[in-house]
Each structure stands twice: as structure tokens, then as C-alpha cells.
Amino acid sequence: SFAGAEAANASQLQSIARQVRGAVNAVAGQVTGNGGSGNSGTSAAAANPNSDNTASIADRGTSAIMTTASATASSTGVDGGIAATYAVASQWDGGYVANYTITQFGRDFDDRLAVAIHFA
């Protein structure tokens, strides 16, 4: 039924949104020195955020594993999933500019994907 299909798609989109939010928050936390998921130390990127430090995370339905050396997290899985990349473009005293790239993997592109980024 139409209602069943809508409910299934809404659930799938909510799952993707949670994955993206977790991915971006984990990477942003690593680069800005606010911690991040799965890592108790400060990454090299957090200690010295500049244009040479790039952090990425990929999630394809499994939990990500953070590594401190490159502030990168990745996982493997089946067809589909997302990747979020965060890179510091420039910085100055008291601030910086960063670029985010969100990529969706899989056979079918879902143009309903929306990303909201909130910093605490």
C-alpha cells in the first residue's frame, strides 16, 4: 500500500540522517578537538587544524572505527550507505572555514536526503 511504502521510506531516510549526523559529528569532533565517537585522544588534525588536515568518515551500515593518526573513520558493508568528509579550508584566530562533502553510495540515488549540521 502507499501508506506502507511511505512509512518504509521515512524509516530509511531517518536511518540515513542518523548515519550522516553521527559521521559528521564524529569527524568534526576529531578535527576541532572536541573528542568524537570512538576516540579518547586528540587527533593530529585537532591539534593543528589547517588546510593539510582532512578528516573523512564512511558508513555503510556498520559501526565506524576511528583512528587518531589521520582522524579518519571507515567501515565496510553491503550496497548503499553514506560518506561524510570534513576538511578545514582556512583558519584565523578564533575561527576557521571548513568544507563538508556528503556522498550517498548505492544503485539508486535518493534526492530526499537532507543534512542538518549543528555544533554544540
From Swiss-Prot:
Residues 29-59 are annotated as: Disordered. It is found in: Secreted, Cell wall. Signal peptide: none annotated. Transmembrane segments: none annotated. Keywords: Cell wall, Secreted, Virulence. It comes from the Bacteria. Its main location: secreted. Residues 40-51 have a biased composition (Low complexity). One of its GO terms (cellular component) is extracellular region. Belongs to the mycobacterial PE family. The C-terminal domain is required for interaction with TLR4 but not with PE9. Forms a complex with PE9. The complex interacts with human TLR4. Together with PE9, induces macrophage apoptosis through human Toll-like receptor 4 (TLR4) signaling pathway. Interaction with TLR4 leads to increased levels of phospho-IRF-3, increase in the transcript levels of IFN-beta and pro-apoptotic genes, up-regulation of IL-10, down-regulation of IL-1b and enhanced levels of macrophage apoptosis. This is PE family protein PE10.
